[in-house]
Amino acid sequence: VTNSVLIAGSLAARGVEGVHMLGGRVRGVTHTTVGSATVDAIRRLRVDVSFVGANGFSLRQGLSTPDPSEAEVKSAIVRAGGTVVALADASKYNSDYLVRFADLAEVDVIVTDKSLPTADHSALVDQGIEVVLA
C-alpha cells in the first residue's frame, strides 16, 4: 500500500502483484496522493509496518514536514501501522518544519545514514528508538 505514484509504478514495472495505490489529489512536488480521500483510505487500513519519510526530525518536535497536506497523510500512516519506521538522512536531524506529524514516542525505528553523530544516535536510542545506520 502506498500513496507514492513513483513507488507504485516502480513496483508494478518489476511485476510485483497486489500493489495498492491510494487515491486522492496528486501533489506534483512529491508525486504522492494527499487530501481527504487519501487520509480516509489510510484510516480504514491496519498494516504490520508503516514506512514514512520525514523532512525533519528532532527530539523536540519529532517528525515534521513543511506541507500540511503531506503531514495529514503521514500522520494517518503512522497511526495505521504496528511498527513505525521513519526514513530520514542524518542531515535532517535537528531540522524542524512547519507541521509535526508524529512524536518520537510513536516511532519504533529510524533509518538514517552513518553521518549521524554518535551523541545524536545515543540521544535517539535513549528515547527508546532503534536507530539503523544504512
What are these regions (language model features)?
Residues 3:
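Active-site catalytic microenvironments in core metabolic enzymes, especially phosphate/sugar-handling
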